[in-house]
Amino acid sequence: KRQTKCIMNIIAVVVTYNRMELLKRNIRCLQQNKPISSIVIVNNGSTDGTTEWLAAQEGLTVINQTNVGGAGGFYTGIQYAYQAGADWIWCMDDDVFPRADCLEQLLPYTGKKDIGILAPRRLLEGEIFTHDFQAYNLSNPFVSMYSKKLAGRHITSPTEITGTAFEGPF
């Protein structure tokens, strides 16, 4: 069950647009074994009832704005979390469903001096996500942006990465 006390100020930032059912599942999945200080939902101008549903929810911080895209939503949410004094910010889209122990698995690495971002392993319908790589090279349009594909479903020790998608980085 979810604990009620949080030692670190951990703020989850979720960006959503017109995917209310996915958002509901995402919020349920954020009820982690280790507590999150707060959940910030950046609603990018949803028109499917999400705005009204969010207004009726308790325990969420909701930022309603016009649709400025995913990156714009993350900018808004990360800025809010930073100004709120977050020690760690957990970013994700509304279609990301972290396992109940995901945060618990990430927390032991937060005290290490050489770690600035933690990225959990991404699975799609229980299978390894096909584009999970250790590095993304966006500087040359003539070569693949992917390098060093991660192999194996379970990674038993931390693996250095130089980039990640906005699908669960902490």
Region locations from a protein language model:
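Short beta-strand-to-loop acidic/aromatic patch adjacent to the donor-nucleotide binding site
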Residues: 86-95
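Short beta-strand/loop segment that forms part of the nucleotide-sugar
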Residues: 37-45, 63-64
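Conserved donor NDP-sugar-binding/catalytic core segment of glycosyltransferases
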Residues: 101-133
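N-proximal low-complexity "stem/linker" segments adjacent to membrane-targeting elements
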Residues: 1, 5-29
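A recurrent flexible, glycine/aromatic-enriched loop bordering the glycosyltransferase active site
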Residues: 153-170
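Conserved donor nucleotide-binding strand/loop of the catalytic core
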Residues: 54-72, 76, 80
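A conserved acidic beta->alpha catalytic loop
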Residues: 29, 43-52, 96
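Short, acidic, metal-binding catalytic loop of nucleotide-sugar glycosyltransferases
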Residues: 28-37
